[in-house]
Amino acid sequence: MAFLKKSLFLVLFLGLVSLSICEEEKRENEMEQEDDEQSEMKRGLWSKIKDAAKTAGKAALGFVNEMVGEQ
């Protein structure tokens, strides 16, 4: 009977360790996925800022050209 108890405790312990390792890997994967999503959002934001700056630069250049042309 004692052998059966020890075997059962060993199986339960190994199962808990395995479950703990799986949960840790799952958390790491979720964190990596969140980081990837944040990187994509930042990339999208920077492209919008770049486009806005390009448009503003073209408008300013056009205005300067008009002012120079009037003189």
Swiss-Prot record:
Tissues in which the UniProt entry reports expression: Expressed by the skin glands.
Q: Which UniProt keywords apply?
A: Amidation, Amphibian defense peptide, Antibiotic, Antimicrobial, Cleavage on pair of basic residues, Fungicide, Immunity, Innate immunity, Membrane, Secreted, Signal, Target cell membrane, Target membrane
| Annotated localization | Secreted; Target cell membrane
Query: Which residues are propeptide?
Result: 23-43, 69-71
Q: Which coarse location class describes where this protein primarily resides?
A: secreted
Residues that bear Valine amide: 68
Q: Which GO BP terms, alphabetically?
A: defense response to bacterium; defense response to fungus; innate immune response; killing of cells of another organism
Family note = Belongs to the frog skin active peptide (FSAP) family. Dermaseptin subfamily.
User: What is known about what this protein does?
Assistant: Antimicrobial peptide with activity against fungi, Gram-positive and Gram-negative bacteria. Is active against S.aureus (MIC=16 uM), MRSA (MIC=32 uM), E.faecalis (MIC=16 uM), E.coli (MIC=8 uM), P.aeruginosa (MIC=16 uM), K.pneumoniae (MIC=8 uM), and C.albicans (MIC=64 uM). Also inhibits biofilm formation. Acts by disrupting cell membranes. Also exhibits anti-proliferative effect against various human cancer cells. Shows weak hemolytic activity towards horse erythrocytes.
Listed name of the protein = Dermaseptin-PT9
Species this protein is from: Phyllomedusa tarsius (Brownbelly leaf frog)
Recall the taxonomic lineage recorded for the source organism. Answer: Eukaryota, Metazoa, Chordata, Craniata, Vertebrata
